[in-house]
Design a protein with these regions (language model features):
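Mg2+-dependent prenyl diphosphate-binding active-site environment of isoprenoid biosynthetic enzymes
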Residues: 1
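C-terminal charged capping/lid subdomain of soluble metabolic enzymes
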Residues: 5-126
Length: 126
């Protein structure tokens, strides 16, 4: 799924960059519920992306685009998954495909990692 997000991003559709802003606690509670939200808060207590600025992103963007170019395309991944018999669609694991954008937006909160997925809200697309 992320390959299908990263490649169009790197293909020149970024119009501007924004400073990173951590997700609002109310949004986390709505998405993860009362039971899971405390663990998500703890996981993100020291947000790995905090302090990343639009200037830093703009400066690093050419290098990030080169890295993205090394990621297999969605078609290549689909072919590989089919070859090994792996699932490749949310619907194959019982999740509605329409939930993909929201899942991609909030998936980075589950683990304390700095990924491009966590920074997606910093990219303003054309």
């Amino acid at each position: 799924m992320v390959s299908a997000v990263y490649h169009p991003l790197a293909d020149g559709t970024v119009r501007e960059f924004r400073d990173y802003v951590a997700p609002d606690k109310a949004v986390i509670e709505r998405l993860f519920g009362e039971k899971l939200a405390p663990g998500i808060y703890e996981e993100n207590r020291e947000d790995v992306a905090q302090g990343i600025t639009e200037e830093q992103l703009a400066h690093c963007w050419p290098a990030l685009r080169q890295i993205i170019a090394t990621i297999p395309t969605p078609a290549a991944l689909d072919s590989a998954y089919a070859t090994i018999g792996a699932v490749s669609r949310l619907s194959e694991i019982g999740i509605d495909e329409e939930k993909a954008p929201e899942l991609l937006r909030y998936a980075p909160l589950v683990r304390h990692r700095l990924t491009l997925l966590r920074l997606l809200p910093c990219f303003v697309m054309e």
